[in-house]
Amino acid sequence: MSWQTYVDEHLMCDIEGHQLGSAAILGHAGTVWAQSTAFPQFKPEEIAAIMKDFDEPGHLAPTGMFVATAKYMVIAGEPGAVIRGKKGSGGITIKKTGQALVVGIYDEPMTPGQCNMVVERLGDYLLEQGL
């Protein structure tokens, strides 16, 4: 299965009539492996800050997390494994695997829990596959 298929079928899937606004699978250095059409372009320093937060949980909390210059308030995640952010009525979930970052960005009517479920389920599967 191609990386694009994972994005199209597993991240941009229909959940109770809703879907993520955008999603992607990136390498740890920020290289895009696959992405949905509307996925924003991360800046290198944004990826570096996200990776630092995985290594040093809490690093982003005081300043917030920036994604394509949009600022997200960092909310409870799983230290070293999942970073979650909130911005207005939407948010972001980033799951780290051995080689990749699985990213989902949502807005209402999708809920944070639905976004978390979709992103973390694929991330857990990739971890099980050694990726």
From Swiss-Prot:
The main place the protein resides is: cytoplasm
Molecular function via GO: actin monomer binding
State its location(s): Cytoplasm, Cytoskeleton
Q: Where is this motif: Involved in PIP2 interaction?
A: 81-97
Q: Which residue positions does Phosphothreonine occur at?
A: T111
Q: Which GO terms describe its cellular component?
A: cell cortex; cytoskeleton
Kindly list the cysteine pairs connected by disulfide bridges: C13-C115
One Pfam family name is Profilin
Record CDD domains: PROF
Keywords assigned by UniProt? Actin-binding, Allergen, Cytoplasm, Cytoskeleton, Disulfide bond, Phosphoprotein
> Which InterPro entries has this protein been placed in?
PFN, PFN_euk, PFN_sf, Profilin_CS
Posttranslational modification, per the record?
Answer: Phosphorylated by MAP kinases.
Q: Does the keyword Kinase apply?
A: no
Instruction: Report further notes.
Output: The variability of the residues taking part of IgE-binding epitopes might be responsible of the difference in cross-reactivity among olive pollen cultivars, and between distantly related pollen species, leading to a variable range of allergy reactions among atopic patients.
Name the protein family. Belongs to the profilin family.
Q: How does it assemble?
A: Occurs in many kinds of cells as a complex with monomeric actin in a 1:1 ratio.
Q: What does this protein do?
A: Binds to actin and affects the structure of the cytoskeleton. At high concentrations, profilin prevents the polymerization of actin, whereas it enhances it at low concentrations.
Q: What is this protein called?
A: Profilin-3
Query: Which species is the source of this protein?
Result: Olea europaea
